């Protein structure tokens, strides 16, 4: 029998020095990680007899063990705390869900450099601009640059193997340097202008282009003057959209907003005085957190736990926290750079701050409204199915293939708050007759529910199958074979017209058939989940089919493994170009001998 946790005995031996504490439940699962200037005083606040917030009380009720680590100072405690949170992601901590690296615009080296999106380590030679807060923001900038300055964005392998201009040249998005249709000096000038834009020097760029336009007009080069006029027009349109532009500094404007339903942190990224975009974060909040606690947790995880992330010279925030000096010191220790955190600001910076607050508030409101909308649909489904309470987990399965090729099954999961994307799964189907959807579904469900015996995964309340009586019957057979506990089975078959709103539903067995009105919230939920499963299956199938078609003809060649196959395709710019190459041309590729080139050629041209 486990000995109950004794707070008094624990506190009597607890140190009053700075450090980190870790709270565990009776099964030794980490519940919460915190830091303190005085460990004893901080931990004592959890075990007072009254005045605890409900979520804090729920945490304390689960505590079976507390461990502490004494540190030399608060800065060391903060660094250790962030390391532990990132590694263990305790359920009662505020957790930043999106930990992906941010994208940059990358300009490669060379005579005709390329603009592209880059994530991760900066290993390639060239210039990096950013970071941008989202892929959408960076694609918008690249699209503008392509329309304005025509710098190529194609892969190097594609560029090196062109024999005639591609479609981008035809629609005036590129000057075709691949086939020598642009003078190197002219291209270099376009690259220089692109760099000026990416560095935030839009005003200087516009002035330079205006001067060039006047000069072209004075020499009667009206075609060149018209081209420059169009470039200036595009740039001024962007400048009008970026009303927040000002100064030349690098600033992140961050606002946190909290209400009983959750929290949102909105970040506006300004680099070189130019707004690159913004992004919403919805941290998983643990115990009842004040807005300042959410802000401190966000800054710690965003800038301290991810030292590879770009660091501006200043943060403008809407709330202050007593840990900010410690945070600044920790960042200086990690990166050797100074950081200013500003709260009371004026003028343009105050407008930035207020805009971030407004965005955070509106984003959280929209998220909660959508959550309530989804929850209402779950309530409606429970009513339709005569359930005592709304289901908490729905799984839907679908199959996608092209005439039996590259068959993929999808599993999507929804809860009362919407899709649970971390639980989505795809299954590559093997060993079944091409086009046999029943066998494919049987394999997918067998693989999914076999894992329950090993304690993996969660049992859904409702299992949706995109199909009619046959698919539903097959799903029931799989569950019976695996002795899966009773759960609700729901088959969704398209009506005779195959239009949304005319679906036929089958509950548990094919004998229980019914339909719902087109405006039924329950039907809308079923359609939403079904369509998401369909989308997830199709994207998986297309990726698998594309990979198969690119590589299958090379997979049987001895001496051509995955790495060499990838290098070959990259060298020639694709399988089609490789198929056109002669034996001598193939032999010139890195790592390919004459004998291996003959084998590759024979394989590509066999009947």
UniProtKB/Swiss-Prot annotation:
GO CC annotation, single: cytoplasm
Gene Ontology biological process terms from the UniProt entry: nucleotide-excision repair; SOS response
Domain of life: Bacteria
Domain GIY-YIG: 16-94
Paired cysteines (S-S): none
Database matches in InterPro entries: GIY-YIG_endonuc, GIY-YIG_endonuc_sf, GIY-YIG_UvrC_Cho, Hlx-hairpin-Hlx_DNA-bd_motif, RuvA_2-like, UVR_dom, UVR_dom_sf, UvrABC_protein_C
Family: Belongs to the UvrC family.
Entries under HAMAP family matching the protein: UvrC
Function, in words: The UvrABC repair system catalyzes the recognition and processing of DNA lesions. UvrC both incises the 5' and 3' sides of the lesion. The N-terminal half is responsible for the 3' incision and the C-terminal half is responsible for the 5' incision.
PANTHER family reported for this sequence: UVRABC SYSTEM PROTEIN C, UVRC/OXIDOREDUCTASE
Known partners and oligomeric status: Interacts with UvrB in an incision complex.
Protein name: UvrABC system protein C
Organism whose genome encodes this protein: Pseudomonas fluorescens (strain SBW25)
């Amino acid at each position: 029998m486990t000995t109950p946790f004794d707070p008094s005995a624990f506190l009597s031996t607890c140190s009053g020095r700075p450090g980190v504490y870790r709270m565990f439940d009776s099964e030794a699962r980490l519940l919460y990680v915190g830091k303190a200037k005085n460990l004893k005083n901080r931990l004592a606040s959890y075990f007072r007899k009254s005045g605890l917030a409900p979520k804090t009380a729920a945490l304390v009720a689960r505590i079976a063990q507390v461990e502490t680590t004494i540190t030399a100072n608060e800065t060391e405690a903060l660094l250790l705390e962030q390391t532990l949170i990132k590694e263990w992601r305790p359920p009662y901590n505020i957790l930043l869900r999106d930990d992906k690296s941010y994208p940059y615009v990358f300009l490669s080296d060379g005579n005709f450099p390329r603009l592209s999106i880059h994530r991760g380590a900066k290993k390639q030679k060239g210039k990096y601009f950013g970071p941008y807060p989202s892929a959408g923001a960076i694609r918008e900038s690249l699209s503008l640059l392509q329309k304005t300055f025509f710098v190529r964005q194609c892969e190097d392998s594609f560029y090196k193997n062109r024999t005639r201009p591609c479609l981008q040249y035809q629609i005036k998005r590129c000057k075709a340097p691949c086939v020598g249709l642009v003078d190197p000096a002219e291209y270099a000038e376009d690259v220089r202008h692109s760099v000026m834009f990416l560095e935030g020097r839009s005003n200087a760029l516009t002035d330079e282009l205006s001067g060039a336009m006047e000069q072209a007009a004075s020499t009667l080069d009206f075609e060149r003057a018209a081209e420059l006029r169009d470039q200036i027009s595009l740039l001024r349109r962007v400048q009008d959209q970026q009303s927040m532009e000002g100064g030349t500094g690098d600033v992140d404007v961050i606002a946190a907003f909290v209400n009983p339903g959750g929290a949102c942190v909105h970040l506006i990224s300004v680099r070189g005085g130019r707004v690159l975009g913004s992004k919403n974060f919805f941290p998983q909040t643990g115990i009842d957190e004040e807005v300042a606690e959410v802000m401190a947790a966000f800054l710690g995880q965003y800038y301290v736990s991810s030292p590879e992330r770009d660091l501006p010279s200043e943060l403008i925030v809407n709330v202050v926290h007593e840990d900010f000096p410690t945070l600044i010191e920790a960042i200086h220790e990690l990166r050797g750079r100074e950081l200013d955190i500003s709260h009371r600001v004026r003028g343009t910076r105050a407008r930035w701050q207020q805009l971030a607050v407004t965005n955070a508030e509106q984003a959280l409101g929209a998220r909660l409204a959508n959550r309530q909308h989804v929850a209402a649909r779950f309530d409606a489904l429970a009513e339709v199915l005569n359930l005592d309470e709304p289901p908490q987990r729905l799984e839907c399965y679908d199959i996608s293939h092209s005439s039996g090729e590259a068959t993929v099954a999808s599993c999507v999961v929804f809860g009362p708050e919407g899709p649970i994307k971390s639980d989505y799964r795809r299954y590559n189907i093997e060993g079944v007759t091409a086009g046999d959807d029943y066998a494919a579904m049987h394999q997918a469900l067998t693989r999914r529910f076999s894992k329950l015996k090993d304690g993996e995964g969660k049992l859904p309340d409702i299992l949706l199958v995109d199909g009619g009586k046959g698919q539903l019957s097959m799903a029931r057979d799989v569950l019976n074979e695996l002795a899966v506990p009773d759960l609700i089975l729901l088959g969704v078959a398209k009506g005779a017209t195959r239009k949304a709103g005319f679906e036929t539903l089958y509950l548990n067995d094919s004998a229980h058939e019914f339909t719902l009105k087109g405006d039924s919230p329950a039907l809308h939920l079923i359609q939403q989940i079904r369509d998401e499963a369909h989308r997830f299956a199709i994207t998986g199938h297309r990726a698998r089919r594309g990979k198969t078609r690119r590589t299958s003809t090379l997979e049987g060649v001895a001496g051509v493994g995955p790495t060499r196959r990838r290098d070959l395709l990259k060298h020639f710019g694709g399988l089609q170009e490789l198929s056109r190459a002669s034996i001598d041309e193939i032999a010139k590729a890195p790592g390919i001998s004459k004998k291996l080139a003959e084998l590759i050629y024979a394989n590509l041209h066999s009947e």
